[in-house]
Design a protein with these regions (language model features):
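Short, thiol/selenol-centered motifs that function as redox-active sites or metal-ligating centers
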Residues: 72-74
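Extended, subdomain-level signal for the structured scaffold at the beginning of enzyme domains
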Residues: 1-65, 77-89, 97-147
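Active-site-adjacent substrate-recognition loops and nearby beta-strands
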Residues: 93
Length: 147
């Protein structure tokens, strides 16, 4: 089951029940050569996924291959744990900003609807930036999105 976050009133965010998904993926079975890019979502899961050694290895493999990587909201917590942000500009949910700085990256505060691109990396601070991060990720992938 997923959780969704929203910005309401004076709270930093509120959490609501999201969607039910059957999880069938196995991190140990991931071959990064089979993927053109990596998109790390936010929410609460990055706090726990960054403790999984294979998740860290996957991120490091994508960066070593200079493949496109996107991370939104709390997603950059995984990037900081993977030690791949040195010298990179990135944004995130504001509470993750100090983690980016401590990992040697440059935290860039932007509006929640914006994204920051630095080389193969695109980041956004929260779900209002879904359009911006997706647009930039598609560009990094070398794809076109037409309606």
């Amino acid at each position: 089951r997923t959780a969704t976050h929203d910005f309401e009133g004076e709270q930093t965010y509120s959490e609501k029940r999201g969607h039910n998904f059957a999880l069938t993926a196995d991190f140990d079975a991931v071959n990064t050569a089979d993927y053109a890019g990596l998109f790390i979502t936010g929410g609460r899961s990055p706090e726990y996924l960054r403790l999984t050694p294979r998740v860290i290895e996957i991120v490091q493999e994508f960066f070593a291959a200079n493949k496109p990587v996107a991370a939104i909201c709390h997603g950059p917590q995984i990037l900081t744990a993977a030690n791949v942000l040195k010298g990179k500009k990135a944004t995130a949910y504001p509470a993750v900003g100090p983690d980016i700085t401590l990992a040697g990256g440059e935290y860039v505060a932007v509006d929640a609807s914006e994204a920051v691109v630095d080389g193969n990396l695109v980041t956004a601070p929260a779900w209002p930036g879904d359009s911006a991060i997706t647009r930039e990720f598609i560009k990094l992938m070398g794809a076109k999105w037409e309606l």
